Design a protein with these regions (language model features):
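Short, structured active-site-proximal loop/turn typified by the sulfatase FGly-forming signature C/S-X-P-X-R
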Residues: 61-115, 174
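Active-site-proximal N-terminal segment of extracellular/periplasmic enzymes that hydrolyze or transfer
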Residues: 23-80, 91
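Bacterial N-terminal signal peptides that target proteins for export
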Residues: 1-8
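A long, amphipathic alpha-helix that forms part
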Residues: 236-250, 257-259, 266-307, 317, ...
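Active-site neighborhoods of enzymes that stabilize oxyanions during catalysis
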Residues: 158-159, 348-509, 515, 519
Length: 527
């Protein structure tokens, strides 16, 4: 019974937080001994990034019109607004945040999704995709993947995060409730006692993050913010906690050159109630007001800091009927031996499925399984929107469900897109909804599809097929979570891929309206 209780408690924390506590008492002591100045006092306006999970343009505009988002309305009217910024792919938070922090797609930062299979380790990697899935595998491994492996191992060490790049230039930064946070400062994460009591988990885990680090109940900057770390407030993984931690840095005049603050609440509400809900945006705006109020007035806030408010991904509405909305590809692949989630992968297994809501990786772990045969079987499902694989020459081949056409491409060539990327293309371009005019590529309903899909197809080792489903549908596999009648993301479609961006306090903007280009722009802002 004790082991079961430990598992339940651990999962409740893991799935809500994906992190552990830093030694905040020591940190605060060090900060009081070594007082810092804000970036503005050092002659440069600090940059504050507010990342609102699943923030979308249309519901944001509606919330503003109804008077439910006055803070975002103020920043928008004081600055610039871009309703369609392209996210990363898969449109899952860990991959998107890795793109935001590194300025690269998944082929360079190596975080393929929330769920994926490591051919090297011969096991599934889950960062907390849902209780049903996590309960079927080694829970302590899930815990370790989320709190340590994601940032310290799986995020490519050869690709600098913005925290690392700023530290290398003598600049300071802060991460507040962000999932991806790797930096140059070592922190000792204190594992909760009920987990540390297990002989498999150490009491402390060493990680690296930015100078100023806050992560829900386990890494608290503001000693007075404990009320927001209670179990009924998701142990600190909430907008109010994030806002008060950021306001604390402002009030203490310790705001560094860059602060990245994550507001998670809107995502959960959009998943449950659908992408048109406004409640999550209203709550996020209230949290933003807390941060702005720390300056005394909102006008002073804009004068003294550069503000960047953006979403990470959109969401597509999922149909209300479970049978109609869910796409289970296991029956299509039924004559293969599909690995079970609750068992180690064996030499007898042939296929592994890693579902990320509206996309999935299908791995052929048996060398006798031909990927092209897997694709042919998948084509029998007409709800599949994109089916992609690499051929023997590293070309990416794309088809669809119930469609015999083929599109193939690879980087480099005579065709150039709006982002200055060049490609070699052949076959049916309508499969990825691009049009060509004088060797110029124009994207349609799949923004920056060539680079984003290329990123996922080269994000990690192994032989695999990438699939996505059409809007309204969600992929399911063994025990994966569903969002019937709510919202889901993960795909390349514009509904999942386009997010709004508010900029206030500077007249500049990223060189392109893509999350992948925000890092370089921020680096210029804090030079």
């Amino acid at each position: 019974m004790k082991n079961k209780v430990t598992v339940v408690l651990m999962l409740s924390l893991l799935l809500l937080i994906l992190g552990c506590r830093a030694d905040s008492s020591q940190k605060l002591k060090q900060q009081s001994v070594n007082p810092h100045h804000t970036a503005n006092q050092m002659g440069k306006k600090p940059v504050i990034v507010i990342l609102i999970d699943s923030l979308m343009d249309k519901p944001l505009q509606e919330a503003i019109q109804e008077g439910r988002a006055p803070a975002m309305r103020f920043l928008l009217h004081q600055g610039q607004y871009f309703p369609q910024v392209v996210s990363s792919f898969p449109t899952m938070s860990v991959t998107i945040d890795s793109t935001l922090l590194t300025g690269t797609y998944a082929d360079q930062h190596h975080v393929p999704g929330l769920v994926w299979y490591s051919d090297q380790k011969k096991r599934m990697i889950l960062y907390g995709n849902g209780a049903k899935e996590a309960l079927k595998i080694d829970q302590l491994q899930v815990f370790n993947d989320a709190i340590y492996q994601l940032n310290q191992v799986q995020l490519n060490k050869k690709t600098k995060t913005i925290h690392e790049a700023l530290a290398d230039k003598g600049k300071e930064s802060a991460s507040i409730n962000a999932i991806v946070f790797r930096g140059r400062t070592e922190h000792s994460l204190k594992v909760p006692r009920f987990i540390a009591n297990s002989n498999r988990v150490p009491e402390q885990v060493k990680i690296t993050g930015p100078k100023w680090f806050s992560y829900a109940t386990f890494a608290q900057l503001d000693p007075g913010n404990s009320w927001n770390t209670s179990p009924w407030k998701k142990f600190g993984m909430n907008d109010e906690f994030s806002a008060k931690e950021t306001a604390f840095l402002i009030n203490q005049k310790k705001l560094p050159n860059l602060t990245i603050t994550y507001f998670p609440g809107n995502d959960n509400l959009a998943h449950r109630k659908g992408p048109t809900q406004l409640e999550g945006i209203e709550k996020a705006d209230q949290a933003l007001q807390t941060v702005l109020n720390a300056y005394g007035s909102w006008e002073e806030a804009v004068q003294n800091a550069t503000w960047i408010v953006l979403g990470d991904s959109g969401q597509s509405a999922v149909y209300n009927d479970r049978q109609a909305a869910t796409v289970d590809i296991r029956p299509l692949l039924g004559h293969y031996r599909i690995a079970k989630l609750n068992q180690p992968v064996t030499n007898d297994d042939q296929i592994v499925i890693a579902a990320n809501e509206r996309m999935a990786y299908i791995y052929a772990i048996d060398n006798n399984v031909d990927l092209s045969d897997v694709v042919k079987l998948l084509q029998h499902e007409n709800k599949l929107d994109i089916i992609a694989m690499k051929d023997g020459k590293n070309n990416i081949q794309v088809t669809k469900g119930r469609n015999g056409s083929l599109f193939s491409y690879h980087p480099g060539g005579k065709f150039t897109d709006e982002y200055g990327q060049s490609w070699t293309l052949s076959g049916e371009t309508n499969l990825v909804d691009i049009t060509l005019n004088n060797n110029r590529i124009k994207y349609g309903k799949y923004p920056d599809v060539l680079a984003r899909l290329h990123g996922a197809m080269n994000s990690h080792e192994g032989r695999y097929v990438v699939i996505t489903v059409q809007p309204g549908y969600e992929l399911v596999s063994e025990s994966s979570p569903t969002h019937i009648g709510g919202g889901a993301h993960g795909s390349l479609h514009e509904q999942d891929s386009l997010v709004p961006l508010i900029i206030s306090g500077t007249n500049t903007r990223p060189k392109t309206l893509r999350i992948v280009d925000i890092k370089d722009w921020i680096m210029q802002l804090v030079k």
